[in-house]
């Protein structure tokens, strides 16, 4: 959608925005302003022609958050903190309301259907698909994806080994490493047609269900 509007001249491209393109040698490159970088470290050779290779920032509002003062949050509102999310699985361990938590810092507002990504200590792999509206710590980024990317597919991508390697490599800070906004927007995402996204989601969820069943039988 955004690329089409740029082509039509209805909006202008951000000069600092990162864009992936294919060079005359048929290889992929990343352009950020006047800087052009090779993406030879990423393996795109086996991708079907119907898939697109893009930057995460081209498909979602990465880093654009709405800050809300806790004084303006209702007691019944869901307040999501990092401790509420299980690492690697993204399972919400508990839902705590504002009246119970009495959180005192500014929060990010999120909506049902958004992908909630923890930029703090990305190696913990905490990514949630919101099933209701709420508010979260500022260490969590609510992401709104364009309609040609299913939220659940985006969530699994953000939890994938490829994205984890990238996030850990780009994180800054020793004790409290974080993935910066600029690097988050530059992350490479491969986008299949929606029908294929649905097939991938079903396959992943089936695998998770089988693993859960095995773990239950071994307990």
Cite the ranges covered by each PLM segment:
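Short helix-capping and inter-helix turn/linker motifs at the boundaries of alpha-helical repeat units
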Residues: 33, 130, 175-179
